[in-house]
Regions:
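Generic helix N-cap/helix-start motif at coil->alpha-helix transitions
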Residues: 96, 148, 168-178, 200-207, ...
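Extended hydrophobic
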Residues: 1-163
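Long internal repeat-built scaffold domains in very large eukaryotic proteins
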Residues: 202-312, 376-505
């Protein structure tokens, strides 16, 4: 992105959000073609949607062609030619000049050769010389240069037909349908499912809705926030599909209504971590889960997330924090490493992330977040401001009277103690607080209510009290079965040997 912006000499003028919206090479190229050698001022966020970029690009080359004195203001020969060629190429790989010429009307016929050369220079079409044999006259063949541009033009034609209440029965490529769904939501404020005169399968409709919501402008996406939340609540599988197709692609756009903030709001809605884990933390295809409502086929994959110094803490970093609840320790390790690396270079942003997530009702997440915070504090070049701000927060929220009850977690206290001690060691924090961060702590500890029936219970009575060595209870008994002779296998082997002997006779 930065290389393209520099090469085309574009001044974004603090419009950092543009980087997140231009998610494909084609969108970036169109943007650079339109705004090259200029300063981007106040820009509407829907102006960088791919369909708007194509529309603006085609309008701009029409103006260039018009300024050359090739057509009048009332004519749109470039656009007309592009739509015509796109329509003809739906059934063919390439076209001859004569085929295009025979489909034209005046005044395009008189300017066709010039128009085709012009749009080829702009990259919309591609030409090659073809010969049947070495003695025949070369013939020019035309094919499409930019596939997304072809999809856009066909979608534009389909949209006009839909608005005229024509029934769309022919089948088109996924790229055309994607462009159509995006044009519909941008210009008609409708999802593709709201049109009765186009027939699509439920699966295709869902895919197109996700594509449109992930790629439309922020203003329009905000209208569908409640709708997306409703889809997320439908099932764990639907939720994971929404995360993969909508939330992940939009989370690098600052304050996107369908991005990581929506995910955070949804996951915080679970009363207990175990309820949330079924939707978010467990892997797919669990054994004996065919009849379970949490059965999933879509794996939550955040391995491709790469954090940069431009990332806001409420964007992709927030997703990585939530992934710390995974039951896969390799996933947790990867997320901790990414957050640590990012936090070292963006300590103020990480401080905001840490304090924002400190009230999540998941001990595993809280422990991992503070382990990252401690790791950053131990860095050789850690900023004093980070140590001071985080130490202040820890003293007010972890080692306060309320905090000792809320964070009654030895792991969290260990990391927090280490952070404050590091601030004291660096001589940026008051040493007098040291007696408050070292046990014993004075507070009313929370005690789990005892089950009275369990006091009189015997072994194997249903309450399973720990009546002998804890290590053996937790470890040995649980693994004992792995070291027993496999009676079923041995029995199977004996029967097999008898069967083989019988048939040998």
């Amino acid at each position: 992105f930065d290389t393209y912006i520099d090469y085309y000499n574009i001044d974004l003028d603090r419009n950092i959000w543009i980087k997140g919206m231009l998610r494909t090479p084609m969108a970036l190229k169109l943007f650079c073609d339109i705004y090259k050698n200029s300063k981007v001022g106040s820009l509407s966020k829907n102006s960088v949607v791919i369909t708007k970029l194509f529309q603006k690009k085609i309008n701009s080359i029409e103006i260039v062609y018009r300024k050359a004195g090739k057509e009048t203001d009332s004519q749109g020969m470039v656009m007309t030619t592009l739509v015509m060629v796109a329509n003809m190429l739906t059934d063919k790989m390439e076209l001859s000049y004569d085929e295009i010429y025979s489909a034209c009307k005046e005044p395009i016929k008189s300017h066709l050769e010039d128009i085709l050369k012009f749009v080829e220079e702009e990259g919309f079409i591609y030409s090659r010389q073809s010969q049947k044999d070495v003695f025949s006259i070369p013939e020019t063949k035309y094919s499409w240069g930019m596939q997304p541009a072809f999809d856009y033009l066909m979608a534009r034609k389909l949209f006009d037909a839909i608005k005229e209440n024509k029934t769309i029965e022919a089948k088109y490529t996924n790229g055309i349908y994607q462009m159509l769904s995006l044009i519909a939501i941008e210009e008609d404020k409708k999802l593709i499912s709201e049109y009765s005169n186009i027939s699509l399968s439920d699966e295709t409709t869902f895919d197109l809705i996700c594509y449109a919501l992930a790629n439309t402008s922020v203003e329009i996406a905000s209208v569908y926030r409640d709708y997306v939340k409703e889809l997320m609540n439908y099932s764990s599988e639907e939720f994971r599909e929404i995360f993969d197709r909508i939330i992940m692609p939009t989370s690098n756009v600052p304050d996107h209504p369908l991005g990581s903030i929506l995910l955070d709001e949804f996951l915080r809605g679970f009363e207990k971590p175990a309820q949330r884990d079924i939707w978010w933390s467990i892997p797919t295809y669990l054994i004996d889960s065919n009849d379970s409502y949490w059965r999933c086929y879509t794996e939550i994959d955040t391995s491709n997330i790469k954090l940069s110094n431009d990332d806001n803490y409420l964007g992709l970093p927030l997703i990585l924090v939530w992934r710390l609840s995974s039951v896969d320790n390799d996933v947790r390790k990867e997320c901790r490493l990414k957050l640590t690396e990012w936090g070292i270079n963006n300590s103020e942003q990480f401080f905001n992330l840490c304090t924002y997530c400190a009230d999540i009702n998941d001990e595993q997440i809280i422990e991992d977040v503070f382990s990252v915070a401690y790791g950053i504090a131990l860095g050789q070049n850690v900023q004093d401001k980070y140590l001071i701000s985080l130490s202040d927060w820890i003293m007010d929220n972890v080692f306060s009277d309320e905090g000792l009850v809320r964070y009654e977690n030895v792991v969290v206290r260990y990391y927090c103690t280490g952070i404050v001690k590091m601030a004291i060691y660096k001589r940026v924090y008051d040493i007098d607080v040291e007696n408050k961060i070292i046990p014993p702590y004075t507070y009313q500890a929370s005690i789990m209510p005892a089950c009275e029936e369990a006091f009189d219970a015997g072994r194997m009575s249903g309450y399973d009290p720990i009546d002998y060595d804890l290590a053996r209870y937790v470890l040995c008994d649980q693994f004992d079965c792995f070291f027993r002779p496999d009676h079923k296998t041995n029995s199977y082997s004996e029967k097999t040997e008898k069967l083989i002997d019988e048939y040998r006779r």
